[in-house]
């Protein structure tokens, strides 16, 4: 991947971090924040959403474009959701626990709490909110975090309700689940102080660490999302939404910089060619006898083929902007927003069953010369007309520069067009929820995870890697409780982190293990009733039989700690079976026999004891 001189390009970037809070109930109702499976839904309903005007009488451009594609939104409701999520009951008062958690997060970011928090409605008509808006309130502003490339300012901290979970995209709409809708969410927006991809990732990691330090945020896939705003000099601000992994942020910034650089180069080339976009038209007759599967299928279903001539665009529609994404892909993104399956263009034709003769006839039909390109859409008449018009408009933009827009992050670091950038016209007051006066004086400062790592190393003599695993893990409180109860710190840490990870890799259902299971197992080791080596086997058995008592199950499995005479008997048996090897190698046979001894004892004996006895028996025979 090309690495640019970001200072020379004038890279400016900012982050929006969206993190679910781990509260018992949702932000504006008493429903639990428990996630559900779609199959558990007990009812469904549908909605059609349309944009509304802001308090200034304006309609947001992003919402307006969304409304041009009429779609049916179906929602899955559960016995753990209510009429508030369905927008059939007014919202309740703002959840106090969520507000307290948000204030604590703001404190860690060095922010100033607002004197009064007013709830607003943010227009969102993509179906992810049943009422066509998301409730949001500013809790704090100002603040900063440190990075190795300088400080990054924090603009604002919003407390919001999470959107509904997108379950299935359909031809005429989307299926959503209400279990996620209304979960409290904080949105942290940085100032545009980020000047490199590496700094963007570092800033996100720092904010993520601060969030997890509170112990009041949800963990797991989908509970945190990052949006990245990127622009370069002469380019435009582009918002990329839905980055799930911190590992993707720097690649995403690099690819967006590359995209904007390529688009600016295309602007210069089009200007030099005196390019122009022609008028879209129906070219169905050109393909009356086509054998192209896509086009033939559309025509057989009563569809049409529409085309737009792109004068001076020859060779540029196929120009790569990002990895495996071209200017033509950008055109296609806009066409698919209006229901088309995609586009064909002459930079890639003849292909896909379209013949050279059909390409020549197409050029003649729209008046395109050798230096021109042509894009086509084959679909039902209305979709084809709307989609090719969208392509024409995006081509016009390509001659002017980089468009401001919202894009969706792809897994490979590239992005795709979603909609225009939203503006202030999407906000208006929520009159059903009274304002609240935050009290920052009650906020306590939690220990940062980085500080916890250092303490674990100093107080418990854990190595840096293990200390970090425990501190950043889900069971650090259990770890501290067990150490206080007398369990060896290294054993407790390895059991709660390393052993669980190994069992998960072996497809053991470790999600069934509870704190009580771990307390029971570690207690058996501390009392001398279970060898450390038997811990993995007992935990695996408990995961399969979560209702079992650890002590009883250990006895059933024969994992009770072996006495020294039992250990010696097992070791002597191994040594005598391998007497020739012992006679020939002496202590050189130790490693091979140690493994056999541990296998014979099946985890019932501590490794140090087995090692000591084995050394004695080998030395006696050497």
From Swiss-Prot:
Pfam families: GAD, GatB_N, GatB_Yqey
Enzyme class, broadest EC rank: ligase
InterPro entries: Asn/Gln-tRNA_amidoTrfase_suB/E, Asn/Gln-tRNA_Trfase_suB/E_cat, Asn/Gln_amidotransferase, Asn/Gln_tRNA_amidoTrase-B-like, GAD-like_sf, GAD_dom, GatB_C_1, GatB_Yqey_C_2
Gene Ontology biological process terms, A to Z: glutaminyl-tRNAGln biosynthesis via transamidation; translation
Catalysed reactions, as listed in the record: L-glutamyl-tRNA(Gln) + L-glutamine + ATP + H2O = L-glutaminyl-tRNA(Gln) + L-glutamate + ADP + phosphate + H(+)
GO MF terms, alphabetically ordered: aminoacyl-tRNA ligase activity; ATP binding; glutaminyl-tRNA synthase (glutamine-hydrolyzing) activity
Presence of the UniProt keyword Cytoplasm in the record: no
EC number: 6.3.5.-
Transmembrane spans: none
UniProt keywords, alphabetically: ATP-binding, Ligase, Nucleotide-binding, Protein biosynthesis
GO CC, alphabetical: cytoplasm
Job description of the protein: Allows the formation of correctly charged Gln-tRNA(Gln) through the transamidation of misacylated Glu-tRNA(Gln) in organisms which lack glutaminyl-tRNA synthetase. The reaction takes place in the presence of glutamine and ATP through an activated gamma-phospho-Glu-tRNA(Gln). The GatDE system is specific for glutamate and does not act on aspartate.
Assembly, per entry: Heterodimer of GatD and GatE.
Family listed: Belongs to the GatB/GatE family. GatE subfamily.
Record's protein name: Glutamyl-tRNA(Gln) amidotransferase subunit E
Organism, as annotated: Halobacterium salinarum (strain ATCC 700922 / JCM 11081 / NRC-1)
Organism placement in taxonomy: Archaea, Methanobacteriati, Methanobacteriota, Stenosarchaea group, Halobacteria
Gene name per UniProt: gatE
